[in-house]
Amino acid sequence: MELDSENKLLKTGLVIVATLVIAKLIFSFFTSDSKKKRLPPTLKAWPPLVGSLIKFLKGPIIMLREEYPKLGSVFTVNLVHKKITFLIGPEVSAHFFKASESDLSQQEVYQFNVPTFGPGVVFDVDYSVRQEQFRFFTEALRVNKLKGYVDMMVTEAEDYFSKWGESGEVDIKVELERLIILTASRCLLGREVRDQLFDDVSALFHDLDNGMLPISVLFPYLPIPAHRRRDRAREKLSEIFAKIIGSRKRSGKTENDMLQCFIESKYKDGRQTTESEVTGLLIAALFAGQHTSSITSTWTGAYLMRYKEYFSAALDEQKNLIAKHGDKIDHDILSEMDVLYRCIKEALRLHPPLIMLMRASHSDFSVTARDGKTYDIPKGHIVATSPAFANRLPHIFKDPDTYDPERFSPGREEDKAAGAFSYIAFGGGRHGCLGEPFAYLQIKAIWSHLLRNFELELVSPFPEIDWNAMVVGVKGNVMVRYKRRQLS
């Protein structure tokens, strides 16, 4: 009897599931975008309904490598609850980068950042307020501010590497991660954090960082231990920065750092930023730059040590600058480092830390692919592009998988020859990375010091890509043998 009851329940369950599936298919047929003409091709995968989701979850880049040759530069992936339309390449991605927020919005797709950044900032506010907050970032990253930050970057690099011995082996990835957070603490979070609270604040940021998991994208408020630690860390950071902000205001003391810029920032209506907003903006700034800078610094060094011709070219550039300026390094001298700039830019082309950029479509629009076909992208789709894939398109970059910094040299400039949005390691258009100049200066300050003061050799195998990280980085150890020297 019990077995019969279980069989009946199983059959009933199967009927219910089958009914729901059929209902969804019927609903999709009558409400689908298929009535529209010129829809992009759709990724087909087995089993139906969930096959595309399974393929996507195995890795967006793996999926793009498989489907781009078959489907082209515009295609849709059905993730059951959402449809993502990919726009790959400058011919079709211009609207992605240039569209207004009312047409293509960041807010919905990046809501998972809100628990980390906190209330009242960035993706927790409407576009008009977010634009004002981005203005605060822009003002904090003006050239006159950057010149002061460079002095701090150089000092931090000198102090950090002075602790290395005459020779030895280090994991350069770990070393650069530590130096980047020290530098960011000084330039962004303020002297108080750097000098007195660095260990405490670093530990709290570590908990914030570890609270951003793949599942956080779908369920940012899920009550799991990592999210609870994230929330406690966010609350504690608010308390720490409230004390620092209050102390600065009471004493009238000012500093040349991003914290001070945010404290002094005012909205158009005259309202000053609150302590909570300042904390949230600082967290957003650190998250935007910390991982990307340390990852790019590591890749840059790994490639320089792998390809001796580029290492020699970067070294010769430093020798020429020393002959011209002496040992001094400042903002203007860093700006003269064109060879090192191209080496960093090429590392970023091959390894942009953010592999996908997304927007939510609020209106229909059309794009025309390289082959002349025009496609209609319906309202309601998530629209995406991939710097990691687009930066390796062979019709834009010659031998795209080869490290070749000279592709950006005068006379070649492959990124410019192919037109706008050909190189998108820092995004572009309305939502281009505000911290791009800061990042280049920071990485140049580090590597110019290393080139001038150390002989370097990569002793571990060339690193692989860590596709499992939220911000795609360098997998495993990157062991480097060093020996002190004085470049002249």
UniProtKB/Swiss-Prot annotation:
Membrane topology category: Single-pass membrane protein
Pfam families on file: p450 (PF00067)
Positions with a binding annotation for heme: C433
GO cellular component, one term: Golgi apparatus
Transmembrane regions listed in the UniProt entry: 12-32
Keywords: Heme, Iron, Lipid biosynthesis, Lipid metabolism, Membrane, Metal-binding, Methyltransferase, Monooxygenase, Oxidoreductase, Steroid biosynthesis, Steroid metabolism, Sterol biosynthesis, Sterol metabolism, Transferase, Transmembrane, Transmembrane helix
Expression tissues: Expressed in leaves, roots, stems, siliques, flowers, flower buds and seedlings.
Recorded catalytic activity of this chain's protein: a 14alpha-methyl steroid + 3 reduced [NADPH--hemoprotein reductase] + 3 O2 = a Delta(14) steroid + formate + 3 oxidized [NADPH--hemoprotein reductase] + 4 H2O + 4 H(+)
Cofactor: heme
Primary location class: membrane
Catalytic class of the enzyme: oxidoreductase
GO MF term set: heme binding; iron ion binding; methyltransferase activity; sterol 14-demethylase activity
Compartments in which it is found: Membrane
EC nos: 1.14.14.154
One of the GO biological process terms: methylation
UniProt-listed PROSITE patterns: CYTOCHROME_P450
Phenotype on disruption: Lack of membrane integrity. Seedling lethality.
Transferase in keyword set: yes
Matching Gene3D superfamilies: Cytochrome P450 (1.10.630.10)
Additional note from the record: Decreased expression of CYP51G1 by antisense leads to a semidwarf phenotype in the early growth stage and a longer life span. Disruption mutants accumulate obtusifoliol and 14-alpha-methyl-sterols and cannot be rescued by exogenous application of brassinosteroids.
Task of the protein: Involved in sterol biosynthesis. Catalyzes the 14-alpha demethylation of obtusifoliol to 4 alpha-methyl-5 alpha-ergosta-8,14,24(28)-trien-3 beta-ol.
UniProt family annotation: Belongs to the cytochrome P450 family.
Protein name per its UniProtKB record: Sterol 14-demethylase
The encoding gene: CYP51G1
